[in-house]
């Protein structure tokens, strides 16, 4: 009986690989997550002390997520990820997060905060389903597109991926959460493009999607006020413009080399969400422009290892999975940086691996474990190099 159980377990995990994986993926992930713990302490210790009576309040929660994330990353690094493309698993990966997104609106289960209902709470446990939905979509889209490389040559073949991504976006936008909606929308378009969708089909989707953005902004008064505050935050310095002004103050105060670690001024209740969505502002204040550049260099190195893993992937499914995982991390990092610097209107999107939030941390670390597992199966020049020697399908 025990032997049968071990056989079942070994079907979804692998004890070793002939070719060792790219350990820099694991190292960079752990480094960024560990740096995040330090940054969270610096950004939150004053608020945690005054509000909860414990300056380590947010750090303790993040350390728990860090520990669980390490376990999840270890497990996923040994995962036989090819099992994820099975019909049953791909649909579970898509449908389960959508069910959880629906439960967000059930009274007594969904948790609201700052006018948005984005979390599920059971007892003392809180889960943000939109974080699961991003990777669930990656699994479904990768498995679907990998079944037939020519599937996306017709618009009919594109529709299942479009409907899956659109359904997730719809559930997320009514929370409301426009930032994650944008993230999933960009992820969907990028994966379809990587999968070989024709340019004309890409434009058929892209143009209406871009036209829908201003409609979504106008449809909600709070989004319109945020847009106005983005254009000129000093018109409402104590209202919608306050967050952006304080973020810019933090970055400006940091200068080239920063005020020094743990010496932020803006964390003293001047900058809201300093430990979460706007933690990059505190990092910029304490470590300066040079510190932010170093952080982006490390994040960029992780993205580059993901791109390299995708290029050397053993098959189309592996290529798409690595591409999707890298896109989620890269898109979210870029959007967060643009928001903090005032380059786009403020949205609630955490900086992956660094911002406070266990759901995002654990799932991101788990995804990097899958990326490592894919890198361990790379073969020579990889599937991408072979594919690029052929005439690209989307330009025909």
Question: What annotation goes with each model-predicted range?
Answer:
Residues 2-27, 31-32, 38-175, 337-356, ...:
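Membrane-helix boundary/helix-loop-helix interface segments in multi-pass membrane proteins
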Residues 64-72, 286-303:
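Hydrophobic alpha-helical transmembrane segments
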Residues 71, 79, 140, 218-222, ...:
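Transmembrane alpha-helix boundary/anchor motif
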Residues 89-98, 155-173, 178-218:
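Hydrophobic alpha-helical segments of polytopic membrane proteins
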Residues 110-119, 123, 201-294, 313-321:
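Hydrophobic, glycine- and aromatic-enriched re-entrant/interface helices and adjoining loop segments
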Residues 145, 187-201, 265-287, 291, ...:
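Interfacial segments of multi-pass membrane proteins
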Residues 151-158, 201, 307-327, 383:
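Membrane-interface helix-loop-helix junctions at transmembrane boundaries of multi-pass membrane enzymes
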Residues 309-348, 354:
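Loop-to-helix entry and N-terminal half of a specific, functionally important transmembrane alpha helix
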């Amino acid at each position: 009986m025990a032997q049968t159980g071990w056989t079942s377990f070994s079907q979804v995990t692998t004890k070793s690989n002939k070719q060792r994986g790219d350990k820099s993926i694991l190292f960079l992930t752990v480094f960024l997550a560990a740096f995040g713990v330090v940054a969270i302490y610096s950004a939150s210790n004053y608020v945690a002390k005054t509000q909860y009576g414990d300056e380590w309040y947010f750090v303790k929660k993040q350390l728990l997520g860090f520990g669980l994330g390490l376990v999840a990353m270890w497990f996923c690094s040994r995962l036989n990820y090819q099992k994820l493309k099975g019909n049953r698993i791909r649909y579970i990966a898509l449908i389960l997060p959508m069910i959880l997104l629906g439960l967000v609106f059930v009274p007594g289960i969904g948790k609201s905060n700052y006018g948005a209902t984005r979390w599920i709470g059971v007892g003392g446990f809180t889960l943000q389903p939109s974080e699961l939905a991003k990777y669930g979509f990656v699994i479904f889209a990768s498995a679907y597109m990998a079944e037939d490389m020519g599937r996306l040559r017709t618009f009919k073949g594109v529709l299942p991926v479009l409907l899956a991504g659109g359904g997730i976006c719809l559930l997320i936008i009514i929370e409301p959460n426009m930032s994650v909606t944008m993230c999933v929308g960009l992820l969907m378009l990028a994966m379809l493009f990587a999968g070989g969708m024709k340019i004309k089909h890409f434009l058929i989707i892209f143009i209406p999607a871009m036209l829908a953005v201003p409609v979504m902004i106008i449809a909600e008064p709070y989004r319109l006020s945020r847009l106005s505050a983005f254009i000129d935050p000093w018109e409402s310095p104590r209202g919608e413009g306050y967050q952006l002004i304080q973020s810019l103050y933090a970055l400006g105060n940091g200068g080239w080399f920063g005020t020094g670690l743990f010496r932020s001024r803006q964390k003293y209740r001047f900058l809201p969400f300093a430990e979460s969505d706007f933690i990059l502002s505190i990092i910029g204040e304490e470590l300066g422009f040079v510190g932010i550049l170093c952080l982006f260099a490390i994040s960029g190195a992780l993205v580059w290892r993901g791109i390299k893993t995708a290029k050397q992937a053993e098959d189309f499914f592996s290529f798409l999975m690595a591409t999707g995982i890298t896109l989620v991390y890269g898109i979210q990092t870029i959007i967060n940086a643009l928001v903090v610097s005032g380059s786009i209107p403020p949205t609630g999107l955490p900086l992956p691996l660094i911002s406070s939030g266990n759901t995002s941390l654990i799932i991101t670390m788990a995804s990097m474990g899958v990326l490592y597992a894919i890198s361990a199966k790379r073969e020579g020049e990889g599937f991408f190099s072979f594919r690029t020697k052929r005439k690209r399908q989307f330009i025909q």
